[in-house]
Amino acid sequence: MYIDDLQLSMDIVSDVTEDYHPINFQLDQNYPNPFNPGTKIKFTVGTDQFVSIKVYDILGNEVASLVNEEKPAGVYELEFDGSMLSSGVYFYKLIAGNFTQTKKMQLIK
């Protein structure tokens, strides 16, 4: 027997039968936190929905609009660049239908 006569066979299963559809809405804590100048924000949309994520300063003034559009159900992650802002505490708020959640983050320069 020679090595040229060797045959290998394998069955590979690569069928995905269902898509992942989250059932809840969720806004995760940004990371890193504190940050300089960028941070990531992860959020989950439970059903197809118009989604808004905005950033506010400590006085409640809107300083950035990160998302303002219809989103299909799924898990998302975005990057926030705070390089144009001063050091301090900021809040980011997710609104999707009747769901609202706010988290705090800190920019340190």
Predicted regions and their residues:
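Short beta-strand edge segments in extracellular beta-sheet folds
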Residues: 9, 104-109
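A generic beta-sheet turn/junction motif
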Residues: 34-36, 96-98, 109
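Extracellular carbohydrate recognition
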Residues: 1-11
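Glycine-centered coil/turn sites that cap beta-strands in beta-rich domains
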Residues: 17-31, 35-55, 65, 77-80
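Short, surface-exposed loop/turn motifs with a glycine/proline- and acidic-biased composition
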Residues: 67-98, 102
